[in-house]
Regions:
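Duplex nucleic acid-engaging cores and interfaces of nucleic-acid transaction enzymes
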Residues: 2-6, 12, 16-276, 282-383, ...
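Long, highly charged, low-complexity intrinsically disordered interaction regions
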Residues: 17-18, 22-32, 378-458
C-alpha cells in the first residue's frame, strides 16, 4: 500500500514538474518572467496553484480589457484604483478620443471597468482564498429540468436536493453528475446564506476597495460586484464542481478497488471436481465438469426451466454426473435463472444423500467477456462460446484469483458508477490491485497460466 501511494505521488510530482517547466518556458518567451514570479512558480506545490499563477499569462482571445488597454485606458483604471478620491466621470473626460471609439466619458469608464475586472479576476492568491471559501461554505443544488420528471424517474431522489459541497457522498455526487449529463438535472451553486455578498466583500478587501463615501468608491464597488458575478462566480463554480468530481471519483475508484480485491482474494474451494452451471431459461443451462486442476471433462445443456420444463430429465442428469464423476462442488452462476437452477441442484443433493456435493452461488460477472476473448478461444478453440462461460464459473470457485486474472478488471463489474469515473485512473488502479493480489498470494510455476504469470512483479 505504501509503495502504491509512493508511486501515485511520484507520478503526480513528475506531471507537476513537467507542467512547471512548460509554464516557465511560456512566460519567459513572453519576456514577462520576473525573479519573484519564477520563485512563486517554483514553490507551487499543486497543479491548481500552478495554473492560478499562470492564468494572467495564458494565451487567450482578444478580450474587452485588451481592447481597452490598446485604446490607452490603463492609466485611467490605475489612477481611479490608486486614488478613490478622484471623480471617475471628471477623470474619464481626459480620455475621450473619437478616433479610438471613446466618444464619451462613459465609454472610457466602461473600458477602465473591463481592465480592472480582468485584473481582479487573475490574482492567484485571491482565487485560492475564494476557492477555499466556496469549498467551506457553498451548497450544491440539483433540480429536475422542466418536463423531464417521467423520463428521469430514476433520478427522483435528486429532483430537489441541496447539500454542502464538501460533505456530499461520492455516490450521490456521481449520480447528480450523471443526471446532469443526461439532461435530466440542472445544478447550481448556492454560495452562502447571503448569496454573493461575502465573496464580493472578499474581492473588495483584497484590492483595498471599501465604500467610505469617496468620489470613486461607488464606481469601484460596482466593478467589484461585476468582477464576482460576471467573471469569478462561474469560474469558481466550474473549479468547485471539478473538485467534487475528482474527490468523488477517487473515493469511488477506491471502493471499486476494494471490491475487486475482495473478489480476487476470496478463499479458493480448492482442487476438487466441480460441476459448473451457467443458468439460462429459454437457452437452457450450460453444464460443464472440470477436474481438480480445472481440465474440462464434460459439456452438456439441460432444459429444466420454462418454456421447456424438462425438470425431471435435467435432475436425473445432474444426479448421474455427480455419481459418475464424483463431483464435490457445484458452482451456479448468479445470472438469470440462478434461483431456479439452485433449486434443481438442491433437489439433486437430497437424492444423493451423504455423497452430495456442496453447492455455491458464484458471481458470473465477466464470464461472457471471457467467453468471447482471444484468450478463451486459444484455451478452448473447439469449444462453443456458451460453454466457456460455464468453465469460467466452475474454475473461479476452485481458484478465484487464477481465473479472474484472465478477465479485464473493469469487466468484472466492481461498482455501480464505474463507467462514470476516469477510465484511465480506474484501469490503472484495478490493474495495480490485480498485480498486488497475485504477488501477495504467489503463483505455482508448474501450473500457473500465462495471464497469471504476467502479473508477477519484476
Amino acid at each position: 500500500t505504501q509503495l502504491r501511494t509512493l508511486e501515485e505521488r511520484l507520478g503526480y510530482l513528475r506531471e507537476l514538474n513537467a507542467r512547471r517547466e512548460t509554464i516557465l518556458d511560456s512566460i519567459e518567451k513572453q519576456a514577462k518572467l520576473t525573479p519573484e514570479l519564477a520563485n512563486l512558480i517554483n514553490a507551487a506545490d499543486s497543479k491548481t496553484r500552478l495554473e492560478d499563477l499562470y492564468l494572467p499569462y495564458k494565451t487567450k482571445r482578444r478580450t474587452k480589457a485588451q481592447i481597452a488597454i490598446e485604446a490607452g485606458l490603463q492609466p485611467l483604471a490605475d489612477a481611479i484604483l490608486k486614488d478613490p478620491t478622484l471623480d471617475p466621470e471628471h477623470t474619464a473626460q481626459g480620455y475621450v478620443n473619437g478616433e479610438l471609439q471613446i466618444h464619451h466619458s462613459k465609454d472610457a469608464l466602461d473600458g477602465a471597468k473591463q481592465i480592472l475586472m480582468e485584473q481582479f479576476s487573475l490574482s492567484a492568491d485571491l482565487l485560492a482564498e475564494l476557492r477555499n471559501m466556496g469549498w467551506q461554505d457553498a451548497q450544491w443544488r440539483s433540480r429536475v429540468v422542466d418536463g423531464k420528471q417521467q423520463e428521469g424517474a430514476k433520478f427522483k431522489d435528486y429532483f430537489e436536493l441541496q447539500e454542502a459541497l464538501k460533505t456530499i457522498p461520492s455516490h450521490r455526487a456521481l449520480a447528480i453528475l450523471r443526471g446532469r449529463n443526461e439532461g435530466i438535472l440542472q445544478t447550481t451553486i448556492v454560495w452562502s446564506e447571503n448569496e454573493h455578498l461575502p465573496y464580493e466583500s472578499k474581492v473588495g478587501s483584497y484590492w483595498h476597495i471599501k465604500d467610505q463615501g469617496r468620489a470613486a468608491d461607488k464606481w469601484l464597488s460596482e466593478v467589484v460586484r461585476w468582477t464576482w458575478r460576471v467573471k469569478l462566480a462561474s469560474q469558481l463554480e466550474t473549479a468547485l464542481i471539478s473538485r467534487v468530481r475528482e474527490a468523488s471519483e477517487d473515493s469511488a475508484i477506491g471502493v471499486f478497488a476494494n471490491n475487486l480485491k475482495d473478489l480476487l482474494l476470496a478463499a479458493p474451494a480448492g482442487d476438487k471436481v466441480t460441476l459448473g452451471l451457467d443458468p439460462g431459461l429459454r437457452t437452457g443451462v450450460k453444464a460443464v465438469i472440470v477436474d481438480p486442476t480445472g481440465k474440462l471433462l464434460k459439456t452438456e445443456t439441460i432444459f429444466p426451466h420454462v418454456p421447456h420444463n424438462k425438470w425431471q430429465a435435467a435432475l436425473a442428469l445432474v444426479v448421474h454426473w455427480c455419481q459418475t464423476y464424483q463431483v464435490q462442488l457445484v458452482a451456479i452462476g448468479n445470472g438469470t435463472g440462478s434461483r431456479e437452477t439452485d433449486k434443481l441442484v438442491k433437489e439433486a443433493q437430497e437424492k444423493l444423500g451423504a455423497t452430495a456435493p456442496q453447492r455455491i452461488i458464484v458471481s458470473e460477472a465477466g464470464a461472457s467477456i471471457y467467453s468471447a476473448s482471444a484468450l478463451a478461444a486459444a484455451e478452448f478453440p473447439d469449444l462453443d462460446v456458451s460453454y466457456r462461460g460455464a468453465v469460467s464459473i466452475a474454475r473461479r470457485l476452485q481458484d478465484p484469483l487464477a481465473e479472474l486474472v484472465k478477465i479485464e478488471p473493469k469487466a468484472i463489474g466492481v461498482g455501480q458508477y464505474q463507467h462514470d469515473v476516469s477510465q484511465v485512473q480506474l484501469t490503472r488502479k484495478l490493474d495495480n490491485v490485480v498485480e498486488d493480489c497475485v504477488n501477495n498470494v504467489g503463483v505455482d510455476l508448474n501450473t500457473a497460466s500465462a495471464p497469471l504469470l504476467q502479473r508477477v512483479a519484476g
